[in-house]
Regions:
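Hydrophobic faces of well-ordered beta-strands that scaffold small-molecule active sites
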Residues: 37-42, 66-68, 96-101, 126-128, ...
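Histidine-acidic metal/acid-base catalytic patches
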Residues: 2-40, 47-61, 163, 167-180, ...
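Glycine-rich, proline-tolerant flexible connector loops at the mouths of alpha/beta enzymes
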Residues: 67-84
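Active-site acidic/histidine proton-transfer and metal-coordination neighborhood
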Residues: 14-19, 52-53, 88-178, 187-189, ...
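Short amphipathic alpha-helical segments at helix-loop
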Residues: 70, 77, 123, 150-151, ...
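Flexible, glycine- and charge-enriched loops at secondary-structure boundaries
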Residues: 75, 82, 128, 159, ...
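Active-site beta-loop-alpha junctions enriched in small/polar residues
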Residues: 44-46, 69-73, 101-104, 131, ...
Length: 282
């Protein structure tokens, strides 16, 4: 691995999880690639609209890429439906950053179908909630298709609750298997978002920019920066972590399903301001 050996890395994160304070921060070495990725949107944020409308709204709001989910573009979509979607994306100047969250199981044939779909739509990353017995299959598939799998956390009670839960399961697997860090859910799990990025450095392929009012299980989603997410610090850490230029950096806003546009526009402005500030630093 490019950061630390997996074993020493997990030992370090175990100490952090236990509450040990360190004199130096983990994973802050500079990267040779400091280019910030494009800002996209997880289309679940626009689930109240039909796909064609949602993509137009994504463009009008200023996003450059989109992350699909099955409710907006199903894995069993026809070739005609996929072609029409790709044509609209091209006309709007949008690219696909990923698709998910998808489940993987020990059914290797079903797992392959998800990868074949991702290849068809041109998704470089699949965000996922993989069963433990799926990893042998995933190791083979990420090599064959050269498509990343990014494990998504879903907060308290989920098997991938904290960053260390993800690190433990990917330890001995292909480096294309990594993390999609939903920063909102990490807030719900009581974890500091910038610290999560440092811990996942080198295996971080997706980000869901999301904020919550309180660091507890039951809380309310809020506009970026109005809860516990320091967006500028998050973008800084992404740059330091060498987040891939084609990584899935997706704003996700789950509130106000029927009329989310004004709120998403406000979130977008916060994120772009932070990105512009960080990109101007030398």
């Amino acid at each position: 691995m490019s950061f630390q050996t997996r074993r020493s890395f997990l030992q370090t994160t175990s100490l952090i999880a236990a509450g040990v304070a360190f004199g130096t921060r983990v994973g802050l070495a500079s990267t040779t690639d400091s280019t910030l990725p494009k800002l996209g949107i997880q289309l679940y944020s626009l689930r109240g609209y039909k796909r064609e409308e949602a993509l137009q709204h994504a463009k009008d709001l200023g996003f450059e890429q989109v992350e699909f989910y099955s409710g907006m573009l199903a894995i069993n979509s026809s070739d005609e439906e996929i072609a029409a979607t790709k044509k609209q994306l091209e006309s709007l100047g949008l690219t696909i950053s990923g698709h998910g969250v998808n489940r993987f199981t020990k059914d290797a044939a079903e797992n392959r179908r998800t990868f074949e779909f991702a290849k068809k739509i041109g998704a470089p990353c699949i965000s996922a909630d993989p069963d433990l017995d799926s990893f042998d299959s995933l190791d083979e598939l990420v090599k064959e298709f050269d498509i990343r799998v990014a494990i998504h956390n879903h907060g308290p009670g989920h098997r991938y609750n904290k960053a260390i839960d993800v690190l433990r399961v990917i330890e001995n697997h292909d480096e294309r298997i990594g993390a999609c860090a939903d920063l909102g859910h990490y807030i719900r799990s009581g974890q500091n978002a910038p610290e999560v990025i440092r811990l996942l450095k080198g295996r971080l392929y997706g980000i869901h920019l999301k904020d919550f009012a309180e660091m507890k299980d039951k809380t309310k989603g809020v506009i970026l920066g109005k809860g516990h997410l320091n967006v500028e610090e998050v973008i800084t850490e992404l740059q330091l972590a060498g987040f891939p230029a084609n990584g899935a950096l997706s704003l996700e806003y789950e509130e106000n399903e029927k009329n989310p546009l004004a709120d998403i526009r406000e979130c977008f402005a916060v994120a772009k301001t932070a990105m512009n500030t960080v990109s101007k630093r030398k």
